[in-house]
Curated annotation (Swiss-Prot):
Catalyzes the condensation of pantoate with beta-alanine in an ATP-dependent reaction via a pantoyl-adenylate intermediate. ATP binds at residues 31-38, 148-151, 177, 185-188. InterPro entries: Pantoate_ligase, Pantoate_ligase_C, Rossmann-like_a/b/a_fold. Beta-alanine binds at residue 62. This is Pantothenate synthetase.
Amino acid sequence: MTEVITSIQDMQRLAHDFKHDGKSIGFVPTMGALHDGHLTMMRRSVKENDVSVASVFVNPLQFAPGEDYDAYPRDIEKDTKAAESAGIDYVFHPSVEAMYPDEIGVALKVGKLAEVLEGAQRPIHFNGVVTVVNKLFNIVQPDRAYFGKKDAQQLAIVEKMVQDFNHPIEIVGQDIVREDDGLAKSSRNVYLTEQERQEAPALQKSLQLAEKLYREGERESKIIVEAVTAYLESHTSGHVDEVAVYSYPELVEQHHIEGRIFISLAVKFSKARLIDNLIIGDEEID
């Protein structure tokens, strides 16, 4: 049976004991509102580690004023049952007061990797992400941590943080998990109206169009971006926030495509901003 732990000290003691006993710890950090994407990572952690921990913590540091922090769905009972169904041993569910008892005196700041894509739209977001992930890594002390490739920029930033701060942790990227119609699973999909939900699979279809152009030999980013943008504008009622082509994981904007590239898009519907991406041109990220 899955045990819920709310105390940082209790989680640290448990992690210390597991380490002392030579057991490997797998960790899936989440903000809750669990869906099949999260559960796929949890099942993988259970398969690959002796002990598996999932965190459920809606991190205020990564939300700017006016974003959906207060509205973000919270249901720890439902999330615990879902985590238990995936075989998770422990759900770490600290309070905001436990994680941030005082005003933050020291926080991490991401460099150039956060100046593009989502980071350009949400300037404080990734600073909040790496600060909380760094804290969670210190508390849970995992051997492996699992992140979804749907947030590929986040994955690249976390991998760089682990490298720069010498965390002895293997970062495992999990393929995007999709609905039957191709929409990437996301906790924010619940915000879509019925009409928007019918339109949302166009995000993946536009990426498939980009891949088709690439496979046919197109190497000019401008042509691919224009084709994807036109497809999204004609197949959804949302506002196309961004379509861009970057190298991966360096996240340098590409004008003429060479090597591994990351095609990223964001569409803003009435109450939800959805992202999707495709990595092509070289071996997939592990």
